[in-house]
Amino acid sequence: MKDYSMTLTALRSASALAAALLLAPALAHAQDIVRHKIPNSDFPIALAVSIPPSATIHFISGQVPPIVDKAADPNAIAAFGDTKTQTVGVLQKIKEILAGMGLGMGDVVKMQVFLVGDPAHKGRADVTGFMAGYTQFFGGAQPNLPARAVMQVAGLSNPGWLVEIEVVAAKK
């Protein structure tokens, strides 16, 4: 009778290796960042975002708009533009910060937006203007949506600012 113990051990090792190779993609997929959609909605935010322990999380401080009219009073809305203009300026700054870290807007998993009531909108935050700027960066060509909160605040540290945005980004 032949000794099959070495052959049996080799077969078991090969089977274990094959199983590991077959399961590896499933395990890697289980570790992906998951964006949970809002049921029955096409609104461009995520209901929630799940981040695996293998991801690195980056907290980006609140960013404010750049000056768009250097001739205007630097403490006036005219210096920074309307809510849409300010939103685009702030998100462009965030995009540049992320790029400097090897990240992109698709890596943003959480966003907090602070909008000041706009005198041109009877003291209410211009959410329509904000969304017009926001959707240039999220929900179109770049489909990854963050969990997001938008709140109206009494004011920001410069009376010309209508928008401040802070984000959290994550990448495996």
Language-model features: locations:
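N-terminal presequence-like segments and the immediate start of the first folded domain
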Residues: 12-92, 96-112, 118-172
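N-terminal secretory signal peptides that target proteins for export/translocation
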Residues: 1-10
